[in-house]
Amino acid sequence: MDIKLKDFEGPLDLLLHLVSKYEVDIYDVPIVDIIEQYLAYIATLQAMKLEVAGEYMVMASQLMLIKSRKLLPKVVETIEAEEDPELQLLHQIEEYRTYKLLGEELALKHNERAQRFSKPKLELIYDDITLKQDKTVLDVFLAFSKVMAEKQEEIKNSHTTIKSDDYRIEDIMTVVEEQVIRQKETNLSWFFKRAGSLNEIITIFLAALELIKVHRVYVKQEHNFDDIILRKESA
């Protein structure tokens, strides 16, 4: 089974998604938290042996610089707005959001005009392998990134040897689905916490995504940053 995750449209698209989860003004977001989530996302892609585009790595290095400045003791210094990397980043995100909203509005008007003056196309395009990048999948992936970061830290601080186990996605899909059927709904974190290795966590994640993709389980999240809940019926 080959599962691929489409990239965001770019690093700013990923940052905008992370910022929007806080539902506050861009300039009021906890920038260090945003940076840590971004870096966890990149680290997770690398742990899963997925290719990370160069532009994401360039942004990661810029974010690490901003984070280090935020965590260092305060030094009295005057920084011009155009030289402040944090402020520059927030300006970039705000500008990207403006253009993205404008693009979505233009696309909507184009579709409305096309429907008014032409017959609808009967062509349907299916993509059986690549998971489409929607909010549900993104939120599941971000929740997974957080767990991966915690598990990697746990293993790093442990003196035990983790054996390399082989986990089949199809087998884990059955385990996840049977648990959801029994309990009606189960937190995704419930499965992660019971995993004994990074390999098992990765397989659980891929199994959950595949179940969501084929509509054998559905996702519920009451509020941003709440646990991801897997359920048998759509909300």
Curated annotation (Swiss-Prot):
One of its GO terms (cellular component) is cytoplasm. It is found in: Cytoplasm. Pfam families: SMC_ScpA (PF02616). Keywords: Cell cycle, Cell division, Chromosome partition, Cytoplasm. One of its GO terms (biological process) is DNA replication. Component of a cohesin-like complex composed of ScpA, ScpB and the Smc homodimer, in which ScpA and ScpB bind to the head domain of Smc. The presence of the three proteins is required for the association of the complex with DNA. Belongs to the ScpA family. Participates in chromosomal partition during cell division. May act via the formation of a condensin-like complex containing Smc and ScpB that pull DNA away from mid-cell into both cell halves. This is Segregation and condensation protein A. It comes from Streptococcus mutans serotype c (strain ATCC 700610 / UA159). The lineage of its organism: Bacteria, Bacillati, Bacillota, Bacilli, Lactobacillales.
